[in-house]
Structure formats: structure tokens, C-alpha cells
């Protein structure tokens, strides 16, 4: 990653060091300004007062990470709040105040906004500070990939705390006063070990850790401890009171930084997330960290039985300073390949309508709407080339080059300007707060990078650093800089590596934390990096884009679309959200309550980087069913976007809608009939994207129609190459071309159907399979926390099989035998629920909940079977066609974790089908 920054610097792509430099800074054939255009603004408060980063002397001059989960510490959006707005680290929430750091652990969702938003809003359980501390402000003192250290000082006392994503601990260093904890209500003490105190506040369990030899003193809602000449103390939120000993082990291993490292090879994206620590007492350097759902779904590292509640679903705890994930990479193509389903004459007509338009840029002036227009035109270049329309192709390329070059040259009506205080590059005319709030740079500039990547595919000289590529890379450094040592731009400005997605607000100045609406415009930038890196031979940027896209793809599936139905609260009556907030999610957009746009804003722009959405076909079907229900019928305004979305799951149905309605609709502003026609008809011919198979280069994809797979890849190289797919098939791709085919070699049935039958084994990772010969293992069933969850799944283990076909055996019923073990824990009871979705449409037609099984406190497997009896059942069974069967298992009673055996014929589900 550092090689990239060095290369950019060597090419002269370095912003001016100070305002004393030349007004226009040359970068290859282009330039940017070091001064904003007259009459424009940079970052301000909400009342328009200019602001500079609110950081300590130690941090001055360093690029500040705007667009982060904690950015309100450094970007003072409100003149009367020099501290911060609520910050959502998960599982903890925080807010800086004059006396220190408020800490909360929201565990109960509220449904607000007429049922359109769920939130786990920050609510103070306690405030960590020093006796007498009364600071006039809070500043950012240091930061790393997902941690930050706020700083308070009142002249006599100073306090620093280190907080972060996934961190159950808050680490504090203070001087000038005793450690002081004030609770929101009188605490209950459940453990008093001198310098270690266990308290319960508002039903949440915390441990307070002072230096050895100190003693915590409780007086009402105030708890203090002298530091005995030391300067450190910490606290942790506990998953249960019996976790105190484990958390005490790591209480003095203070986190000092966080780093993610990523790599791409052979169709797999790997990432390692590491915390650096220092031992304040003893020698322990390990720690505990809570993984989000999108992380623990893709790690093979051992996890503890400890869990936390969060707006992103259950977080699972890892006892280590690092963990790693591995995912199949998300497919990207510069355009869908050629197919027999596209009529050349018809496509030519549609292409000419755009290319010969009197205003192909739709009068766009600002960075966002110019970007949308660039995106529309760039999608058509490969299509024109595909059908031999070189004149149209070259005309479109000329339009793209001309408009990009206008923006990439300072001094005209449109330009980019560098702000040396905020270390950012802003395009003027700006829009949607991209200037005053530093919002949405990744949304806007992603279109520019994508368009430049399409140009580079056909004109490598244009893309050279010495020509226009230098300015493209400067936009990349502003939005997705892979370097942590670049003094001109922050590391990955918009992308939160731990949260797994980007944030849109530059200042994060909301009670609900930061937010992102259009996740698809975020992945548009990631796909653009894949294409630009591939086209220019920059494998570092290509691999960065692949990591960003693959990571955010899973986060979108889980947190925007609730693909596994394990994230949104059961009381939230929606299947998708238009916006994700730090505190939760909202069925809304910033500008409209129209359901079409709420559902479509996380789809557009539809490009060869959108194929990842096809990995969750049931979620797409649920999404569109809800859209029509909320809309009172089929889409009217954003028909094309939603037809294209449907084609990723059900191409034939999407084509039927296109055929019936293509003559009477107006394309969405970033779309064209040429692209929509080609997209829908190509997928109808080749089939929907198949995310189960990956190629060994990022620019490859697989489509499946019925039992037929079509392999596609684009080769940017100057000689032919063979692309190998994960199922063993290979495809020879000529130089600088896209190729498709049925593949050669490999297993003719690389993913064979498992043996037919109605008996399913459980597999760790959440699968049900009729295949035998699995590896024996076990999964941990989360503790019920001492509450009664009889009849209601609570942090359940979920096992599922999709695409099931079968005939219901009349009179037969579900059967199961599950091997469970509570170890030596007393009073646990495991409960099972079996659900049947007969058609795979995302709605369960039959749900059966069984009486729980009370395990004994003796280590060893016990068998839980359906003979315990049904507790409740809804719906009815019938013929299953492409259906889904789901098994959920949870602890209905008790306060402790238990285990469920997997990978054997002793833990099975038998369905009443043949």
C-alpha cells in the first residue's frame, strides 16, 4: 500500500504544502487549485462559520479522518458543542462532555419515525472522567484504523481515553485527579475486589479497573479511585457477570492502535485485523474484541461464547489481538458480455439516441450530477464496442475525456481545489455538502474514476500519470487513500474498515451517529478502483478495490438488506433500509419517502460492479415485494433501476416487465434505455450472476441459467491469458477483450447436488446438507443472559438450506435429533424452531417451535429431539419448489452458553418430504 503513495509522489502527484505555493498546482496534463474559487466555502459549522480540525498540538498538521464513526470529535459542526455528538463504536456508545466520556450500551431497540426507523440510541450508563475535570472542549489526540483517542484538559487535569469499534474496554490515562466514574443511576455492586469493581447500571454489567494497590470507593452514583502515582485505569462492559475474571485478565493490556491488512489472490480476499497493545501491569498483551456479523461469518478463528447486542446484530467475542477473514471476491466486469439475446439494430438505435443528444450531460454543473452523467455515458462505451459501433464508441469516449479534462484543469468554471487545513480535495461547483460538510466525496468521485477507467481501457496514453492519470489518482487519494503515511490525505477517508462499509457525512454530527444512504454509490467507487487498477496495471489499487467491494458487499447484504433476517429487530416492519446509521437503520432517504427511491438508492448506478448484489436472490425478492406493497403497485418512476435489480435474481421476470413497459418510461437520470435493454436481455440470456464460483482475476464473473453456467472475463493485458475458475473450469481470453464461454476442463459438475433425501446434517457456518462425511465439530449457543426466551429466538444459531424441491408426505411431520451439551452450567434449556419457505420468496409458510430441552450440568452430549413436543406452529406445509428450510437453536432459559454438535449423523433435521 505504501508503494502506491510513493509512486504517486514520484510522479509529482503531491498537493501544495502551503498557501504560499502556486495557485494552480500542475499534475501531469491537469491541475488543481490550492485556493477555493471566489464566493465558495470550505468546512463550516451549521451556521456557516469556517472551522478547522479540532485536534491537539500532537495531531496538528496530520490528515484528519473525516467521514468516520467518531469524526465529530475533530469536526465541530455546532458552535455550542465543542465536545462531540454521540459516537457509535459498538458494542459501546460514547459522547464527549466537559467532565469526560459518557459510555452506554444500548440493548433494546426503539422503533421511531412512524415505524420507519429502528435505533439503539446512545443513552448514558456512566461517565468516565477525573475528579474535578471541567474541560472547555474535547479534541482528537491520535487515531488509527478504527480507534481514536479523545483528549480533555482544564489546565489542572488532563484525560485521554482510547475507544474503538468492537472494543468492550475503554482505556484511560489521566493526571491531576482521581479516577472518577459517575453512573446514571445508583449502581448495584456485584463484585468488589479492591482495585477491581463489578457494577450493574440499567441492567448492564461493567467492570472498573484501577491500578494494583488502589481501591474503588462507591458513594451513591459516584465511584472514585486514587491512582497511587500511576496514570491509568480502564473499564469494560461485560456480557455477563461471570465474565469478570476473563476481562480482568486483559484490563491492563491497553490498546494503542489498530491496523487492517488485506490481500487478493486467486479469487479470495483475505484481511487481518490487528490491535497493538502495551502492558500497563504484568506481561499480558492480548485483548478481547467483538466481531460484527459480516466478520464472524467469514472467519475460521476460534471465538468465545461471549456475545453483545448491536444495531448490526449479534457481535461475537474473540480472545486475541487479531483475527482474519476470507471471502470469495465480488465479480466486476467493465460491462456485461455480448449475448444472443441483444438485438444489434435495436441497441444501435438506443446508443445513437444518447450519443447524438443535444445535451448528453443533461446540463450537469456540480460534482454529483456531472458524475451521474459521466456514469451514464461510460456504461455505453463497452456496449458500442461490443457491436462494432466504433464511431459511437469513440464519440462517447470523446465526451468523457472532454468533460473529465475540464474538471481536471484548474481555473475554469469547474475545478478541484485542495484544502491544506482539512487535507482534502473538493470539486467546485460542489453539492450536497461536499464542500461545507465534506460529505459524499466517495459518491461523487467514484463516477469520475469509473469514467476514467473506461477511457483507460481504450486509451492507455490518456491514463498515464504524465497525462490525465495523475489527477485521477489524486481523486483516489482523497476518497480511498491506501497509505497511512501520506501527509496530504487521510487513510481511506470514507471507508470504515471495521464497520465494513463507508460513511457519508464528513462531520458525523448527528444524535444517531454517522450514516450512509447509497451503499451502491460507495461500491461504485470500489468497482472503479478495480477497473482503473486493472486498466493501468496498478495491482495495488486493483486489489484495494477488490477488498473494499467484497467487504462492503457483505455489509450491504446484512445491514441494508438483512439478507439472513438476523439483524433488523423483529419489531421493525421493513425488509430493507434506505439508510444505515450508527444507531440503526431507516426506511427512508434524505430527499423523499417514495418507496421506489428508498429501495432503488442502494442499487444505482447499475454497472458491471453491481453483480455482487445477485448473491442474495431471496433478499432481492423480499425487497421488491415490499417495494410494491409500500408503493401500492409496481414501480413508476425508477422502473429501470428496479427492473435491473430484479434481473439479478429473476431475469425472466425482469424481461417481462421491460417488454411490457419499455416504450412508456423515462430513464432514471444516470441510466439510459441502451444500457437497461442490454443489461436485462443479457441476463435473461446468460442467467443471473452466480456468486458461488469465482475467477482468478477480479474482472471475471459467472452466470447460471438453469443448469448451464457461462463464464466471462475481461483481459486488460497485451497478450491472451487463461482465467481459471474455482470450479476448475478455464476460459481463454484474448488480449484487451472480454470473452465468454462454457469453460473447459474442470469438474463437469463442480458443485454437485448432494445426495437426495430428506435428512440434513448441520454444518458449522450455518448450512444444512444432505451430504454425509462431514467433519465433527460444534457451535456455541449464546447465553440467554438469565432471561426467559421460551418461544422467542434469542441470538440463535441458524442453519439453512435453499433451493429445496420436494413433495409433502401427507400425515408426516418434522423430526430432529440434536446433540447438545451445557457442560457444568446449571439450569440451561435449548430450544429449536424449524421454518419452511415453500417457494423461496423470503416468506416462511410454516413455522414450528418446539418445547425446550433442559440439559443437565454434566459434561457430555445429550440428545434433544422433536419428541419434546410442539410449543407452537403456524401455517401449513405443501409442495416445495425452490424452497428454503431453516433451523434455529437458542438457549431459552438460563445464564450460560452451551454447545450444539455439527458435522455428524447424530445431529440431523428430517423434513416430511420426498
Regions found by a protein language model. Give the residues of each.
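Proprotein-processing/basic-patch segments
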Residues: 754-813, 817-828, 879-914
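Conserved aromatic beta-strand anchor motif in extracellular beta-sandwich/beta-rich domains
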Residues: 832-838
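Aromatic-rich carbohydrate-recognition surfaces in CAZymes
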Residues: 364-384, 435-473, 518-526
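Secretory targeting and sorting signals
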Residues: 1-22
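Ser/Thr/Asn(+Pro)-rich, low-complexity disordered segments
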Residues: 23-442, 482, 486-495, 533-536, ...
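Acidic, glycine-anchored loop motifs typical of Ca2+
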Residues: 779-780, 840-842
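Ser/Thr/Gly/Pro-rich low-complexity, disordered linker/stalk segments of secreted
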Residues: 744-756
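Short, surface-exposed tryptophan/glycine-enriched loops
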Residues: 512-515, 853-894
Amino acid at each position: 500500500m505504501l508503494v502506491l503513495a510513493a509512486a504517486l509522489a514520484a510522479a509529482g502527484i503531491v498537493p501544495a504544502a502551503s498557501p504560499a505555493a502556486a495557485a494552480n498546482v500542475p499534475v501531469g496534463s491537469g491541475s488543481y487549485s490550492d485556493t477555493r474559487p471566489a464566493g465558495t466555502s470550505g468546512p463550516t459549522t451549521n451556521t456557516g462559520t469556517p472551522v478547522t480540525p479540532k485536534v491537539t498540538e500532537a495531531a496538528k498538521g496530520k490528515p484528519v479522518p473525516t467521514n468516520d464513526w467518531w469524526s465529530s470529535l475533530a469536526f465541530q459542526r455546532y458552535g455550542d458543542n465543542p465536545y462531540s455528538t454521540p459516537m457509535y463504536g459498538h458494542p459501546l456508545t460514547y459522547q464527549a462532555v466537559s467532565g469526560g466520556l459518557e459510555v452506554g450500551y444500548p440493548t433494546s431497540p426503539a422503533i421511531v419515525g412512524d415505524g420507519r426507523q429502528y435505533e439503539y440510541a446512545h443513552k448514558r450508563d456512566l461517565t468516565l472522567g477525573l475528579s474535578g475535570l471541567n474541560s472547555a472542549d474535547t479534541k482528537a489526540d491520535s487515531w488509527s484504523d478504527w480507534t481514536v483517542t479523545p483528549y480533555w484538559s482544564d489546565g489542572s487535569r488532563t484525560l485521554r481515553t482510547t475507544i474503538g469499534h468492537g472494543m468492550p474496554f475503554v482505556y484511560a490515562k489521566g493526571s491531576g485527579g482521581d479516577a472518577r466514574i459517575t453512573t446514571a443511576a445508583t449502581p448495584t455492586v456485584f463484585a468488589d475486589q479492591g482495585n477491581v469493581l463489578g457494577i450493574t447500571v440499567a441492567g448492564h454489567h461493567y467492570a472498573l479497573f484501577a491500578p494494583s494497590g488502589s481501591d474503588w470507593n462507591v458513594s451513591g452514583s459516584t465511584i472514585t479511585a486514587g491512582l497511587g502515582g500511576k496514570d491509568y485505569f480502564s473499564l469494560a462492559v461485560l456480557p455477563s457477570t461471570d465474565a469478570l475474571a476473563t476481562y480482568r485478565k486483559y484490563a491492563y493490556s491497553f490498546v494503542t492502535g489498530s491496523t487492517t491488512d488485506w490481500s487478493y489472490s486467486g479469487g479470495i480476499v483475505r484481511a487481518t485485523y490487528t490491535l497493538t497493545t502495551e502492558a500497563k501491569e504484568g506481561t499480558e498483551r492480548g485483548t478481547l474484541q467483538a466481531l460484527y456479523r459480516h466478520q464472524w461469518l467469514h472467519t475460521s478463528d476460534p471465538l468465545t461464547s461471549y456475545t453483545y447486542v448491536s444495531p448490526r446484530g449479534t457481535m461475537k467475542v474473540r480472545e486475541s489481538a487479531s483475527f482474519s477473514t476470507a471471502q470469495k471476491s465480488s465479480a466486476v466486469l467493465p460491462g456485461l458480455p455480448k449475448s444472443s439475446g441483444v438485438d444489434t439494430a435495436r441497441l444501435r438505435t438506443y446508443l445513437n439516441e444518447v450519443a447524438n443528444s443535444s445535451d448528453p450531460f443533461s446540463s450537469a454543473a456540480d460534482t454529483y450530477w456531472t458524475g451521474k452523467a459521466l456514469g451514464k455515458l461510460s456504461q455505453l462505451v463497452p456496449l458500442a464496442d461490443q457491436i462494432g459501433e466504433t464511431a459511437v464508441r469513440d464519440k462517447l469516449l470523446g465526451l468523457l475525456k472532454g468533460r473529465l479534462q475540464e474538471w481536471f484543469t484548474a481555473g475554469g468554471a469547474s475545478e478541484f481545489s485542495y484544502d491544506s487545513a482539512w487535507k482534502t480535495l473538493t470539486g467546485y461547483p460542489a453539492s450536497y455538502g461536499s464542500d461545507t460538510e465534506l460529505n459524499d466525496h466517495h459518491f461523487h468521485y467514484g463516477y469520475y474514476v469509473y469514467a476514467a477507467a473506461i477511457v483507460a481501457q481504450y486509451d492507455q496514453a490518456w491514463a498515464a500519470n504524465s497525462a490525465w492519470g495523475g489527477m485521477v489518482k489524486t481523486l483516489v487519494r482523497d476518497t480511498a487513500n491506501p497509505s497511512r503515511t501520506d501527509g496530504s490525505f487521510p487513510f481511506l477517508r470514507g471507508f470504515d474498515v471495521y464497520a465494513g462499509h463507508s460513511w457519508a457525512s464528513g462531520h458525523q454530527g448527528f444524535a444517531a451517529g454517522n450514516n450512509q444512504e447509497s451503499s451502491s454509490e460507495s461500491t461504485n467507487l470500489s468497482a472503479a478502483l478495480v477497473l482503473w487498477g486493472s486498466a493501468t496495471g496498478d495491482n495495488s489499487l486493483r486489489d484495494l478495490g477488490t477488498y473494499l467491494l467484497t467487504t462492503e458487499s457483505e455489509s450491504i447484504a446484512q445491514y441494508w438488506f438483512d439478507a439472513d433476517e438476523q439483524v433488523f429487530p423483529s419489531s421493525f416492519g421493513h425488509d430493507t433500509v434506505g439508510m444505515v446509521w450508527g444507531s440503526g437503520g431507516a426506511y427512508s432517504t434524505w430527499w423523499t419517502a417514495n418507496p421506489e427511491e428508498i429501495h432503488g438508492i442502494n442499487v444505482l448506478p447499475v454497472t458491471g460492479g453491481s453483480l455482487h448484489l445477485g448473491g442474495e436472490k431471496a433478499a432481492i425478492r423480499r425487497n421488491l415485494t415490499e417495494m410494491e406493497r409500500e408503493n401500492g403497485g409496481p414501480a413508476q418512476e425508477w422502473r429501470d433501476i428496479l427492473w435491473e435489480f430484479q434481473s439479478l435474481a429473476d431475469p425472466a421476470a425482469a424481461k417481462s416487465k421491460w417488454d411490457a413497459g419499455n416504450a412508456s418510461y423515462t430513464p432514471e437520470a444516470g441510466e439510459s434505455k441502451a444500457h437497461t435493454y442490454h443489461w436485462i436481455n443479457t441476463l435473461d440470456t446468460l442467467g443471473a450472476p452466480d456468486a458461488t464460483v469465482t475467477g482468478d482475476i477480479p474482472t471475471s464473473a459467472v452466470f447460471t441459467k438453469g443448469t448451464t453456467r457461462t463464464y466471462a472475463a475481461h483481459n486488460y493485458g497485451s497478450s491472451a491469458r487463461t482465467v481459471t475458475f474455482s470450479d476448475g473450469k478455464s476460459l481463454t481470453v484474448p488480449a484487451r477483450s472480454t470473452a465468454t464461454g462454457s469453460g473447459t476442463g474442470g469438474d463437469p459438475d463442480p458443485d454437485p447436488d448432494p445426495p437426495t433425501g430428506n435428512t440434513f446434517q448441520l454444518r458449522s457456518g450455518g448450512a444444512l446438507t444432505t451430504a454425509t462425511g462431514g467433519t465433527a465439530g460444534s457451535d456455541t449457543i449464546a447465553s440467554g443472559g438469565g432471561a426467559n426466551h421460551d418461544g422467542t429466538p434469542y441470538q440463535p444459531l441458524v442453519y439453512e438450506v435453499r433451493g429445496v424441491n420436494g413433495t409433502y408426505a401427507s400425515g408426516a411431520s418434522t423430526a430432529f435429533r440434536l446433540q447438545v451439551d451445557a457442560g457444568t452450567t446449571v439450569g440451561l434449556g435449548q430450544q429449536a424452531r424449524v421454518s419452511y419457505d415453500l417457494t423461496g420468496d423470503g416468506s416462511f409458510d410454516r413455522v414450528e417451535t418446539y418445547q425446550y430441552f433442559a440439559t443437565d450440568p454434566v459434561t457430555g452430549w445429550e440428545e434433544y429431539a422433536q419428541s419434546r413436543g410442539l410449543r407452537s406452529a403456524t401455517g401449513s406445509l405443501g409442495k416445495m419448489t425452490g424452497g428454503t428450510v431453516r433451523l434455529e437453536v437458542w438457549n431459552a432459559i438460563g445464564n450460560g452458553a452451551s454447545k450444539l454438535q455439527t458435522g455428524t449423523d447424530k445431529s440431523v433435521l428430517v423434513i416430511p418430504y420426498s
